[in-house]
Amino acid sequence: MTLLSIDDLVVEHRSPGRPAVRAVAGASLAVNPGEVVGLVGESGCGKSTLARAVCGLNPITAGSIAFDGEPVTPLGLRRRKLTGIQMVFQDPYASLNPRRRVGDQIADGLRTSNDTATSPADLLERVGLPRDFAGRHPHEFSGGQRQRIAIARALAARPRLLIGDEPISALDASAQSQVARLMRDLAVDSGAGLLFISHDLSVVRLIADRIAVMYLGKIVEVGDTAEVWADPRHPYTKALLQAIPKPDGMGVLPAELPGDVPDPANPPGGCRFNPRCPFVMDVCREKEPEFGPVACWLHEPK
């Protein structure tokens, strides 16, 4: 059974006196138990908004999100804990309470899951940290150590779905791959699903079973990671991979691709990538491709 099912999700940001911005514009995605799905795309494409909607932190405008067959939005904080969904945020410095010992913060999750057999020190050990760190405060640790503590805190609630929203981008290079592999191993070993959002294609390539590529609020390509890397089909996916300077196809997403990113408040008609696409056809400007796993008129199902 599918663990997480996102169907035609729409999330709008509204500000007084300004038009609504569709940060997520009809995205569909699934995550299965024990599966790691990597979500990639340029900054501002809607990845984090989608993740926060899954956690119930952003209200949805249309579409649906189901966790284990049950709707998960809108949710308050307490209800979110009860769903078995936990999120590891981008900034390990901001995600931990500086005034509380890390062991006490991990213990909050253990109480949520009614786990009386596991101690905070046990979870610190699972994420590769010494047991005596439980008695210390967040300011005493490096960024990589803090993110491991944040992972331990998330695991304490025994989640069935773990979401990493750019969880390695604030870390130094030496810690990034270690933390990403740790999240994968812990999620898979427990049978949980992992939705991993990152700009770092090298890490996504190493840990993800499947990859989803997002552009201007839309999922434009989904597939097995190895297959997408070997044969990217959507022109946007091809552009992302071709723009990486490393010859092995590994590396961080470039800051910019050729062409200007359209305004999300006023997206182009038809396919949203058509102003930047080298293969654009008349139909691309006239009609949006509403099919998958590759949302491109070049790959219209027969």
Task: Set out the residue ranges of the language-model regions.
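Conserved ABC transporter NBD signature motif
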Residues: 62-73
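Conserved ABC ATPase "signature" region
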Residues: 117-132, 241-242
